[in-house]
Amino acid sequence: MGDGRVSDPVTTAEGVGEFIVLAELSTALSSRLAGWSSDGADPDTSATMASLAARLGEHAGWWMDRIPESVLLEGERTAASGAGRLTDVLALLDVPPSDRRSAVAPVLDRLVAYLGVLSERLSPIGDAPALRTIRLVLADLKDRPR
C-alpha cells in the first residue's frame, strides 16, 4: 500500500515475540557457526563460518534492542523465549563437516525470506527502527553461502 498502511500489521506484543525468536535464533546460529569455525573439521569454510558467527551474534543484540522493556509485555517475552522452532532449525545443521556450507545456506535463505515477509507487516513510521534493523541484517547476509 502506498499510503503507509500495512495489511495485517504486527502488534507490539507480536513484535516482542518476533524479536525474541530472532534474537535467540541469531544467538544459537552464531554459537554453532563459531564452533564450526574453530573445530578444525573443515578448514575451507572456517573463515566464512567465523564471519557469519560474528555478524549473527551482533544481530542478536540488535533484535534484543527492539524489544520494549515493559512489565505489561512480560508474558509475551516468556512465551516467545525458547520456542520449539529453534530446535528444529538447529537440527538442520546436524551434518558432517563436509556438508556444513550446504546445510547453513538454506537456513540463512529462510531467515532472509522470513525477514522480507516480516518487513511487509511493519509500519514504515511506527516500526522504522525495526525496519532499519531488518535492512542492516539483510545487508550483512548478502554474502551468505548459497
Task: Specify the residue positions occupied by each region the protein language model found.
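Internal, well-ordered domain-core segments that constitute the primary functional module
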Residues: E120-R146
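Leu/Val/Ala/Ile-rich N-terminal alpha-helices, chiefly Sec-type signal peptides and the beginnings
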Residues: G2-D44
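Short, highly charged low-complexity linear segments
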Residues: R85-P96, L111-I125
